[in-house]
Structure formats: C-alpha cells, structure tokens
From Swiss-Prot:
NCBIfam families xrefs: ispH_lytB
Catalysed reactions, as listed in the record: isopentenyl diphosphate + 2 oxidized [2Fe-2S]-[ferredoxin] + H2O = (2E)-4-hydroxy-3-methylbut-2-enyl diphosphate + 2 reduced [2Fe-2S]-[ferredoxin] + 2 H(+); dimethylallyl diphosphate + 2 oxidized [2Fe-2S]-[ferredoxin] + H2O = (2E)-4-hydroxy-3-methylbut-2-enyl diphosphate + 2 reduced [2Fe-2S]-[ferredoxin] + 2 H(+)
Name used for this protein in its record: 4-hydroxy-3-methylbut-2-enyl diphosphate reductase
Cofactor details (free text): Binds 1 [4Fe-4S] cluster per subunit.
Protein family: Belongs to the IspH family.
GO biological process: dimethylallyl diphosphate biosynthetic process; isopentenyl diphosphate biosynthetic process, methylerythritol 4-phosphate pathway; terpenoid biosynthetic process
Function description: Catalyzes the conversion of 1-hydroxy-2-methyl-2-(E)-butenyl 4-diphosphate (HMBPP) into a mixture of isopentenyl diphosphate (IPP) and dimethylallyl diphosphate (DMAPP). Acts in the terminal step of the DOXP/MEP pathway for isoprenoid precursor biosynthesis.
Residues that hold (2E)-4-hydroxy-3-methylbut-2-enyl diphosphate according to the record: H40, H78, H128, T171, S228, S229, N230, S270
EC code(s) of this entry: 1.17.7.4
Amino acid sequence: MKIVLAESLGFCYGVNRAVEATKRLLKEKRDARVIGDIVHNEIVMKKLKDMGLKVYPDLSSIDFSDTAENSVAIIRAHGASPDVEDFLKRRFGYVVDLTCPIVYNVFSLAKDLEKKGYFIVIFGKKDHAEVKALCGRLNDYLIVEPGYDFETIKAFLREKKPKKVALISQTTMNSESFEKLAEKLLKLEGIEVSVNNTICNVTINREKMAIHLAQTCDAVVVVGGKRSSNTGKLAKIVESHGKRAFHVQNPEQLPDLSIYRKVGIISGTSTPKEQILKILDYIKFTYEGEVIRNGGEV
C-alpha cells in the first residue's frame, strides 16, 4: 500500500496559538475557564481538561462560587460576541482573548461594511461559535446556511429592500459553495452587491489538497474531531469526487483498508500532529505501507 500525505497537516496558526496559550496558562497554575471548546477536537480538549481547564457550555452555567485571584477567562479561537466579552471582563479580573486574528479581521470587515450602509449576508452555520460571535457585532444580517433555497433568500431581500448587500463567510466554509452563492447574488437586479471571500486561505488550501488526494488515491483518511466544521468539510469534498472518505479520530475507528492500493491522509486545522502520527503509524505497520510525503510532514 502507498500512503500519501497531504502537503499541509496539523494545526493552523490560529488554533496552535490558542492551544499553546491555554497550555501556558494551565502550566502557570492559573484557574483557566472557557465557554465552549478551545478547538473542536475531542482529544485536544481532553488533554486541556486533564491539565485543569474548566469548560462551560454557556454563560449561565459558569460557577462563580469557586473563583479565585488566579482565575482567568479565555475567549476561544472562534471569538465571542461583545456582550459575552463584556460579561467576562466584569466577572473575571483577567481575560485572555485568543480569537484567531483571521476571524477577528472578518469581524472588523463586517462592522465596517455595515457602517457603510451594506446589509450583511453571512454564508455560514447559525449554530457555529464564529457565526454567533460575528452576529453579536451586527445590527441586522441574514445567515445563509449550506443547502439554502435561493428563492427564499430573494423573497427575504425583496421584503427587506436593501440598496446594498455585502456577502461574507464563516472562515471554514466550502469556497466553491461560497462562489456559487456570490454568483447568484450578483445577478440580482436593483441591488449593489459586494462580495468578500473571507474563507481562510489555509482551509482553502486544504480543500485543494482533499481534491488532489481524491483524484490520485483510492480512499482518503480524514483525521480530526467529529464536531470540527473544516474537518467534516474535507470528508465531504473527497466523497463528492467519488472516493471513500474515512473521518476518524483514532486508529480504532478505521475500517479494513486492505482493499486499497493507495490511501491519502489529510487533517482538519484543529487536528494535532501527534493524532495524525498515530493513525499514520497504524496504517503503515498494519498494511506495510510506503509513505509518500508529497511535501507533507508529521
């Protein structure tokens, strides 16, 4: 079996920055708390919790009865709405903002466009943390999720009657789907449309790698958390190109791969390299695989 590694694997800059900063706080014995997962990777989150990180699903679930002088609130890589930020600053003496710089740039762009009179259309998932943080900064907006009905969007805009519309995206969405939505919006009559592709370049490059692996391999192993938007997207891209994609977090989740002569390996941007290495080693030793690095290193 030949095992082909994607050119880029592991954490992106924003995720690595957030994880390493959280580890430093925990090593300093800070009482670190966060609303939601730092990253959407179950293995990474278990390690951080084992180090002492306290994770709460929402603001109302935070227990303030045991806060101490060394307590610190963390704003995760996806960002937080201004209301949440203000609340944390009031209740904690120290707040560490680990919002990904690329995500923060999207927040700033959206606010600037709104100030210029644009009605904001967001291509993203309404329950995703990044989208929630973005919406908390805007006065009015429309979220367009995958699988949208464009006639419904047209009807909404006819009723809303905006003169100008600005399209932006959650940073981890599928770039091809974004472009298709942009193309449809640009055809609307009587509305000035500004298209702003705010999808992260790292995720766009991973999409291209997923397509390349699907075109050159018999199957592709996609390594990453089950709740990771960008990891799940890679698996869907592979399958859309007619190849089997196995979205796994550990070797135990892999099926029998003996029927495949060439298997690709790619990861989401919230997947640590040690997680990828475990799966690579398992495939290599189980199937006597030859690793083709293709520029990729683990």
